Amino acid sequence: MHLKISDMDMLHGSLAGKLLLFTLPIALSSMVQQLFNAADTAVAGHFGSANALAAVGTNTEIIALIVTVSSGLSIGANVLIAKHVGRNEAEKLPAAVQTAMRLAMCIGVIGLLLGQIAAAPLLRLIRTPEEIFDAAALYLRIYMLGYPFLLLYDFSAACLRARGDSRYPFLALLLSGFANVGLNLLFTAGLRMGVAGVAIATDLSTMLSAFLVLRRLAKDAVFRFAILNQRSARNGVWSILKTGIPSAVQGAVFCFANIFVQASVNRFGAEAIAGSTIAMNFEYVTYYIITAFAQAATTFTSQNHAAGEFWRCRRILRLCLGLSLLCSTVPFFAIVLFRDTLSGLFTPNAAVIQSAGVRILCMLLFEPLCNLYEIPAGVLRGSGYALYPALSTMVGTCAFRIAWIYTVFRAKPTLPMLYHAFPLLWAATIVLTALGLLALRPFAPGSEHPHTTAQSRRV
């Protein structure tokens, strides 16, 4: 059965242009998703109080953990679909998509229930100040009501991207992003609903994005998704979880370590929390450029690895590293140069702007280092080695970072000393990931495809 790839053929021809075309919508999608939270922060800061801004802000790392776990789990669906595409197994795609959507809904409902139970304990864990605790808990509980729709969007988008369609998920998220801003202003500035209005706006916009991508899956001639269809892929759940769980753990461990950092930031009061929140919005937006290339590396590697095109897998690694470094460095330095002006978009409070500047100076200058472990990790996941990147992240970012907090930071408890941990631990993770790439050797040596042509070799 002939399989028509939606937007591009990842198995033949030039790679560089296709990687850029594929990556740009993913990066923009992630940025728009982060702008949901940035809009929440900006509206809370301008139409509420400093405490309202801090209540939303203290949830930033918890929500980043939730979003990262969802995205990580969806990578399993992406790899499963991409391997079927690489092997030209079009007949297996409808059942695989059906399995992915059922799994997303089941995990989403479980997450919704856990969110209602765990909201207060999580906020206690990170030492949320009492003056903002109730508002922060309310925001998190309402936010978690939309968790099933977040998972449905992520899994649906992962399925579409596996066939080369990264454009439609971006357009769906862009539309819901505009809706989020409008609803934020309506509920918070107009109806004065406070942090509850901010959270409800995010939930409704997430529902819209999920509806749009599910509609696309239903109309796709190959996927043929239908809610009442009972087809399922044999071993499909295990195939998704085998890659998805390590990827989710990798992201979760990274965010979990950041929650420990957030707990340390919380000791410095509401202004430090608000400043850190503003800086994190910029960090995530720029970091998503890197993770978009890592996602591209995973998808392209999955298809080519399944098709036996190992030489192209090596080319994918090199190109993604080079392009990601090139595309990410300029925004990092632009944010550093204009940090005060950009922070002023979120709040007029001079002390908060200064606090945001401290974090930006300590971290964003070094964030391009993340390319050197995220891209190889994406290639390893696409090659079927999802566990090692999770383990290296667990050691390099979680264990070392927590150790830093309880040793170096405890000896000198200042915000710069806390933030300096990040670039040092990124370097440690780079070393661990490089060792894994050398040891696992995911691309067989001398595995040039016998039918490779000059056209397919051309970058």
Q: Where are the regions that the model predicts?
A:
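Residue-level signal for transmembrane alpha-helical positions in Major Facilitator Superfamily
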Residues: 20, 24, 36, 73, ...
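Small-residue-rich hydrophobic transmembrane alpha-helices
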Residues: 41, 53-113, 150-169, 275-333, ...
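N-terminal transmembrane alpha-helices
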Residues: 10-47, 61-76, 80, 105-112, ...
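Short alpha-helical transmembrane segments in multi-pass integral membrane proteins
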Residues: 1-23, 81-146, 188-245, 301-366, ...
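Transmembrane helical elements of multi-pass membrane transporters/channels
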Residues: 21-40, 142, 153, 176, ...
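Short runs within selected transmembrane alpha-helices of multi-pass transporters and secretion channels
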Residues: 74, 143-161, 169-180, 198-213, ...
